């Protein structure tokens, strides 16, 4: 009944209008869009970050590489999204530009947090513009600092998530997309520090299998491993049975 009253009064028609109960309804609707998207799990491991993403059903008509959900932002940053894929594409390109501009200007790699903050700022602005809707996408960024802790200030491997409102937080492990709350509950119970990247992928797949039940198939999943080898970042992408 409350939603109907808000709709009748027009509070759900603009991203810039607060409802009397303090909510911005267009933002809340956008959050529902994210939970319709396929899920992804990110886990900080020992000297690495892993992301495992469900692309749902495999279509034999689609070229597999073109549907991979793990995106390289820079040689030391990867990202995945849940929600409207076209919205995600715009923000991914923005993140790449931010990272490259930092390299050109300062002759060094941008910190993961600085890239995430720029993307979060863009998302926040679209909760205030009249005539524009919020970005219907949540994004998870994994990053690593080659050679030590100095650049991030608090650890070699990091994981950040941005939400609809432009807020961002750092996590040890997190999930976005369909069934995210169920997945996060299982992560809280099973996550351990200093997992190897292989153990991190195994944990993510075990959780997906438990959540999806009979619908689970290894062929549905993409994985990204971001690690440091010989003082340099390395991104390895895997799909399907390569994750086992």
Predicted regions mapped to residue ranges:
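Long, low-complexity N-terminal extensions
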Residues: 1-244
